[in-house]
A protein has these predicted regions:
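Conserved catalytic submotifs in the C-terminal HATPase_c
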Residues: 88, 93-103
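Conserved HAMP-HisKA connector
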Residues: 1-9
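Short conserved segment of the HATPase_c
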Residues: 184-195
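Short alpha-helical Gxxx[C/S/T] motif in the catalytic ATP-binding
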Residues: 207, 211
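Conserved DHp (HisKA) dimerization/phosphotransfer helix of two-component histidine kinases, i.e.
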Residues: 36-86
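Short beta-strand/loop element within the Bergerat-fold HATPase_c
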Residues: 134-171
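Detector for a conserved hydrophobic position within an alpha-helical segment of the HATPase_c
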Residues: 215-216
Length: 246
């Protein structure tokens, strides 16, 4: 029998909610438990489980689309503004270029928004990691172990950038998300779209597999390219979405 992940997730989520409620009741009647070592870890672990269950359900439903007429010029500009506002308190330079005459065509805008914000969020994480590494005078965090003579003057002037570009090419809509962050190690490139594979300190490893699944359900492709970009071994990573125009 085919395993219904959504049903399993629902069955697990119910007792998980009860556990969380019980913890809150214990804290309310016995505030001293907040001082117990690792008590806060319980909340973190439960939140992680809830996130995992939500992403499992989303992954299971990734190929089920609810398409509607979508004006990609308006749609992508809204995403650009939304992301720009989320990083306004950082030093990240966000460069958005939405070319004119993008198509109006059927698409699941809710799921595509999820994909694009996930890719932009990953880019944000990558440049912030790189910025933190540089500000601490450490070796480049770009998986370049051979470079032990990092020019700290360059490290201190590191300028995080994220590029969001959309254009029409022949009969395809192309959207790319690029960053000059910490990059992806060559040995990891072939596995980042596999479920539960993650090279972050946190995360479920379902974000990129779900993103690719959603794009493929639209008849498109999601690819990644990561290569050395600057002399101090910063890497540039680009994720490219290609969606056919009907």
């Amino acid at each position: 029998h085919r395993m219904d992940i959504s049903t399993i997730s629902h069955e697990i989520r119910n007792p998980l909610t009860l556990i969380y409620s019980t913890l809150q009741m214990i804290e309310a009647s016995n505030p001293e438990v907040l001082n117990i070592r690792h008590w806060s870890d319980l909340h973190s672990d439960i939140e992680y489980m809830k996130q995992l269950l939500e992403e499992l359900s989303a992954y299971n439903n990734g190929q089920r689309l609810s398409p509607s007429s979508t004006d990609f010029d308006i749609f992508l500009k809204k995403i650009s503004l939304s992301f720009a506002s989320s990083i306004i308190e950082t030093d990240i330079e966000f460069i958005s270029r939405i070319e004119p005459e993008l198509p109006v065509m059927p698409a699941d805008s809710i799921k595509l928004r999820e994909v694009l914000l996930n890719l932009l969020g990953n880019a944000r994480d990558a440049v912030l990691i790189q910025q933190s590494t540089c500000s601490n005078h450490l070796d480049s965090a770009c998986n370049c172990e051979s470079n032990r003579s990092l020019d700290t003057s360059k490290a201190l002037t590191y300028s995080p950038q994220i590029h969001f570009h959309a254009w029409k090419e022949h009969s395809n809509l192309i959207i790319s998300v690029s960053d000059n962050g910490c990059g992806i190690a060559p040995e990891h490139l072939s596995s980042i779209f596999e479920p539960f594979v993650t090279y972050k300190s946190s995360g479920t490893g379902l974000g990129l597999p779900l993103s690719r699944r959603i794009i493929e359900a639209h008849g498109g492709t999601l690819t990644v390219h990561s290569e050395p970009d600057l002399p101090d071994c910063q890497l540039k990573t680009t994720f490219t979405l290609t969606i056919p125009i009907p």
